[in-house]
């Protein structure tokens, strides 16, 4: 509110810096006597008042949180239940996740993937930022077992595997003597041999088209009776063992039987005919051996023009020579 009270300020008793002036009420006597030496001024008190603008008051402080006794009271049981639910949700969110990423989409086993192009289940494992191929298998179970062995070998017994560690006790003992590279190669060999119908042993494979060779041992004897050629100890022989045949030492080079006396063949004997009773078209018997034609060698001759050409020495002197045993 404005102060409209009138006041008389004295020039002697008033200070300029004074906020509240000294007011003297006007008396009737002073107002009548104009000869008063002390001059006075009539002023409003509002002119000398210093108006100070204050900041707005601060907001009230928030209410203090409820104490433990208040939370445990009968009227605030719902607060306790909500806090318990929050703790359960936090525990579910903070649950330990797998270190090796999510499971494969094509298989419910870890580290196993199905490839439609090959139609097989392939197993992979990550080691030092690289994906290591463990092999391709016919079933997802065998691929998962291969992944578990590799995970135990690479990361120890605390690795994330598909089955129980106790199932691999025998494999763990074998892994100790093998390096990582050797162990991976053994898994790949096992997968490749199983794909070809092989065995777990090295260089052993199952071939359906060769099973009959091992089931019937009498085939070798039957082949010998039918004069079939078979391989035995690196030598090729003709197994003709009949009762009426007296000469069993047949030579396969010419296919004819030798005499009773065994002799060593010479190079000229290989030019003998297969049948001595062969006749020619004119009715004349041919010799019992094949003729050998001797051809003179060729010789390079220089022509008069300076260009060389090839000619035959004595082309008319071709002769026929025969070997006579």
From Swiss-Prot:
InterPro entries: AP2/ERF_dom (IPR001471), AP2/ERF_dom_sf (IPR036955), DNA-bd_dom_sf (IPR016177). This is AP2-like ethylene-responsive transcription factor SNZ. 'Schnarchzapfen' means 'snoring cone' in German. It is found in: Nucleus. Pfam families: AP2 (PF00847). Residues 52-79 are annotated as: Disordered. GO terms for cellular component: nucleolus; nucleus. One of its GO terms (biological process) is ethylene-activated signaling pathway. Induction: Repressed by miR172 after photoperiod changement. PROSITE patterns: AP2_ERF (PS51032). It comes from Arabidopsis thaliana. It comes from the Eukaryota. Probably acts as a transcriptional activator. Binds to the GCC-box pathogenesis-related promoter element. May be involved in the regulation of gene expression by stress factors and by components of stress signal transduction pathways. Repressor of flowering. GO terms for molecular function: DNA binding; DNA-binding transcription factor activity. Belongs to the AP2/ERF transcription factor family. AP2 subfamily. CDD domains: AP2. Residues 108-164 bind DNA. Keywords: Activator, DNA-binding, Ethylene signaling pathway, Nucleus, Transcription, Transcription regulation. Residues 54-67 have a biased composition (Pro residues). Gene3D superfamilies: AP2/ERF domain.
């Amino acid at each position: 509110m404005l102060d409209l009270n009138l006041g008389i300020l004295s020039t002697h008793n008033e200070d300029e810096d004074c906020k509240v002036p000294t007011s003297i009420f006007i008396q009737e006597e002073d107002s009548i006597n104009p000869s008063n030496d002390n001059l006075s001024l009539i002023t409003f008190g509002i002119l000398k008042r210093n108006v100070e603008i204050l900041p707005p008051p601060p907001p009230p402080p928030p209410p203090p949180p409820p104490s433990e006794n208040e939370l445990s009271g009968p009227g605030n049981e719902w607060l306790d239940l909500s806090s318990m639910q929050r703790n359960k949700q936090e525990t579910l969110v903070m649950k330990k996740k797998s270190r090796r990423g999510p499971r494969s989409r094509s298989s419910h086993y870890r580290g196993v993937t199905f490839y439609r192009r090959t139609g097989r289940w392939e197993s992979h494992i990550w080691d030092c930022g690289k994906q290591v191929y463990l092999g391709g298998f016919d079933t997802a179970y065998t691929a998962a077992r291969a992944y578990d062995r590799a995970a135990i070998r690479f990361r120890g017994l605390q690795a994330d595997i598909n089955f129980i560690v106790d199932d691999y006790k025998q494999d763990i003992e074998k892994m100790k003597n093998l390096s990582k590279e050797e162990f991976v190669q053994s898994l790949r060999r096992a997968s490749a041999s199983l794909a070809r119908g092989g065995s777990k042993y090295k260089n052993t494979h199952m071939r359906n088209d060769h099973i009959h060779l091992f089931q019937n041992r009498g085939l070798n004897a039957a082949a010998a009776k039918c004069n079939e050629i078979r391989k035995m100890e690196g030598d090729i022989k003709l197994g003709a063992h009949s009762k009426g045949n007296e000469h069993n030492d047949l030579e396969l080079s010419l296919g004819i039987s030798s005499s009773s006396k065994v002799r060593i063949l010479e190079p000229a004997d290989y030019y003998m005919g297969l049948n001595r009773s062969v006749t020619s078209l004119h009715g004349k018997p041919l010799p019992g051996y094949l003729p050998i034609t001797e051809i003179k060698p060729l010789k390079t001759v220089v022509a008069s023009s300076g260009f060389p050409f090839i000619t035959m020495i004595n082309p008319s002197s071709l002769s026929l020579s025969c070997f006579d045993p």
